[in-house]
Amino acid sequence: DSQSSRGIFTIESEQELRDRFAETEAFTNSGDYVLVERYIEGTEFTVDGIVIDGTHHTLAISQKEHYAYNRNIASKLFFTNYNETFDYDLLRKTNDELISGTGIKYAITHSEYKFEDGDYYLIEMAARGGGSRIASDIVPFMSGVDNYQLLINAALGQTPSVEDLHTSDAEKMKERAAVLEFLDIESEGKKISKIEGVEQINAIPEILQLQLEFKEGDIIEKAQDDRSRVGFFIARAESKERIEEIEKEVKNTLKVSFES
């Protein structure tokens, strides 16, 4: 009942449980307890959508990657409208049926799933949009649907309809892609002496945002939870191939130097 993956750990021994228990309990907001779940192996996904008159409509899906040193913290969300490996139509159906069954009338939504042994397992869901500009900028780009405007209209008594979800550019939207990628930089106790490449990256037309949570003189460490990640960039393009090119360009352009 917290947020930002704080207090979440993958436990593989009794000693790890003892070592992590107090920290996990400290992030519980509703009492002196912790939640223990079976660990679900497999690839993780985010799913954003909107509920209109009690029926949920999935609008954007991302496949997640995680830091090698902590598999509970996402390092990248790659958005596409179809996936050659995973059945996104099944994921849409699963998500739509599940959220429609909650009885909520109007809301934007953000859910997370894992795929294991042929099934999608719900990890969490909420009646809010995905953070880091997912709901505000990535979802409309991927779907052609202004989800926030529809929600505002509903709050003002202007009932949205399913027709508002239709777009004349559906075929064009199908090939679109976007990425929210978090930086993986550690200074190993040394202060940052120089940061280069920011202006060049911001000049890339498809870059929506480059956010650095550090400056020259800082000492930065590996992320311990979602909130302690040191920065990110968001890119949107008409194809996943272009997104992959931009990812390489950003990594080759951003240079962070440290004091010797």
Language model features with spans:
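A short catalytic or substrate-binding loop motif that flags glycine-/basic-rich loops and adjacent residues
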Residues: D1-S2, Y39-G42, G103-K105, E175, ...
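Internal nucleotide-binding/catalytic subdomain
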Residues: G7-Y120, G129
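Active-site "cap" helix and flanking loop/linker of ATP-utilizing ligase/carboxylase catalytic domains
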Residues: L90-S111, A126-K191
